[in-house]
């Protein structure tokens, strides 16, 4: 076994991990990045459509173009990294953290003062949404179908049904249509699309692909291969209405039914997770409840845009490097509270008055709202106020403020009310 020592270890070589490693390096830390796949870039390697980088670079880039800019900078800085490497154990000890890594070079014992969790997220599967029927070939997550088409150059279907209107599902509806497949429809159990409005228009409406709201797949037919699926409309409690059932012949069912942050290593280290985001509970520096462990990107919460993933990677890397310098004051955290009837989640969940001033806050509304004013306050002092013409659970919103630590006297509250 080989033993290695670093200031910061970054787990994940996608857009968040690359940004975190670059940021930590630029702030003086000795960094190791660990990536389990054979190439850097994360999921962006297979996202050949454009639309990335509008916020970060002010231009429309494909996924490989966006990640390529970070990879080139990362390599030019000479930051140490391991690909085809998997963390099998992680523990906190008196002088930092010890990670056991299985790699092509053998078993590595990696020690560090800080760890950045940037492992991204994974897709829900058919077993996690309780679809009845056999388990024939032809049931894919949207990401798997995307990998077949964009990386392997293979067509996984000629006639498919897509369950769920997440962004990847809608993007794959367009991609499969362009490659000659027939997409019978996109079926969404909720009464509003789950993905961005621009994807509804650009991927579905522009290609005449039908979107069926308040409808779900209830059964899969086929033994060796998918032959058909049963779809039903649902009531207000999202229970299938049996009288509306109909059979749709197809050779594949593609699932776009949500994403889950990857936090197995975080849990090994004792990181507390937020039931709302399925990611870590953090303060504005993105440090978790375990001192020295930071979380960013889709491992923290599922983002709509990769630009925000990179932004949180920047913050986590900078914070990890500062933590390693050892001059951080004792934490003085106040909780961030919000109305759970109106907000699905708010990140960060705490504000540390002893840490870096200012805050970038992310939130997702629980449903559709029109003409709303969102206020972040401490006591009677409004720290941030922003007005929104439209709010939707399909789109994450961002609030920013500087120089607020001296104004925080009590817990922070996030509220939403009709604009006057």
Regions found by a protein language model. Give the residues of each.
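Short, aromatic- and glycine-rich surface loops/edge beta-strands on solvent-exposed regions
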Residues: 361, 374-376, 401-420
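Aromatic sugar-binding surface patches on proteins
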Residues: 391-400
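FAD-site-proximal beta/loop scaffold in flavoenzymes
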Residues: 117, 139-149, 252-303
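FAD-binding core/adjacent interface of flavoenzyme oxidoreductases
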Residues: 1-11, 68-159, 235-243, 254, ...
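A Rossmann-like FAD-binding core segment of flavoenzymes
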Residues: 74-101, 177-264, 357-390
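Beta1-alpha1 glycine-rich phosphate/pyrophosphate-binding loop at the start
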Residues: 6-69, 73, 147, 155-202, ...
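Mid-to-C-terminal Rossmann-like scaffold of FAD/NAD(P)H-dependent oxidoreductases
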Residues: 307, 315, 319-387
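Predominantly flavin-linked oxidoreductase catalytic cores and closely associated redox partners
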Residues: 108, 114-211, 216-225, 292-295, ...
């Amino acid at each position: 076994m080989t033993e290695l020592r670093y200031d910061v270890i970054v787990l994940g070589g996608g857009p968040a991990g690359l940004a975190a490693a670059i940021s930590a390096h630029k702030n003086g830390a000795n960094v190791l990045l660990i990536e389990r796949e054979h190439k850097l870039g994360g999921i962006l390697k297979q996202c050949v459509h454009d639309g990335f980088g509008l916020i970060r670079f002010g231009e429309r880039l494909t996924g490989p173009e966006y990640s390529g800019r970070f990879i080139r900078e990362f390599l030019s800085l000479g930051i140490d990294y391991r690909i085809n490497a998997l963390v099998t154990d992680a523990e906190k000890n008196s002088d930092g953290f010890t990670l056991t890594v299985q790699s092509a070079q053998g078993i590595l014992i990696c020690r560090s003062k800080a760890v950045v969790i940037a492992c991204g997220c994974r897709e829900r599967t058919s077993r996690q949404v309780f679809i009845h029927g056999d388990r024939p070939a032809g049931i894919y997550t949207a990401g798997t179908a995307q990998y077949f088409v964009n990386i392997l150059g293979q067509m996984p279907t000629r006639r498919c049904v897509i369950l769920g209107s997440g962004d990847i599902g809608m993007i794959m509806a367009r991609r499969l249509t362009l490659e000659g497949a027939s997409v019978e429809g996109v079926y969404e159990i909720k009464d509003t699309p789950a993905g961005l409005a621009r994807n509804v228009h650009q991927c579905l409406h522009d290609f005449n692909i039908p979107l069926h709201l308040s409808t779900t797949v209830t059964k899969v037919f086929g033994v060796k291969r998918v032959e058909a699926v049963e779809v039903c409309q649902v009531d207000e409690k999202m229970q299938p209405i049996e009288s509306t059932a109909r059979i749709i012949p197809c050779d594949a069912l593609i699932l776009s039914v949500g994403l889950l942050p990857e936090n197995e290593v975080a849990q090994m280290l004792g990181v507390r997770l937020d039931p709302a985001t399925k990611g870590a509970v953090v303060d504005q520096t993105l440090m978790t409840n375990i001192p020295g462990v930071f979380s960013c990107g889709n491992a923290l919460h599922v983002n709509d845009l990769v630009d925000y993933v990179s932004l949180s990677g920047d913050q986590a890397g900078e914070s990890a490097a500062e933590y390693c310098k050892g001059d951080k004051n004792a934490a003085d955290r106040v909780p961030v509270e919000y109305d759970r009837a109106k907000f699905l989640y708010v990140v960060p969940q705490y504000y540390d008055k002893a840490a870096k001033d200012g805050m970038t806050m992310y939130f997702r509304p629980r449903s559709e709202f029109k003409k709303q004013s969102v206020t972040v306050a401490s006591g009677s002092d409004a720290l941030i106020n922003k007005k929104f013409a439209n709010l939707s659970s399909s789109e994450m919103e961002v609030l920013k403020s500087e120089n607020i630590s001296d104004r925080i006297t009590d817990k922070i509250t996030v509220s939403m009310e009709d604009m006057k």
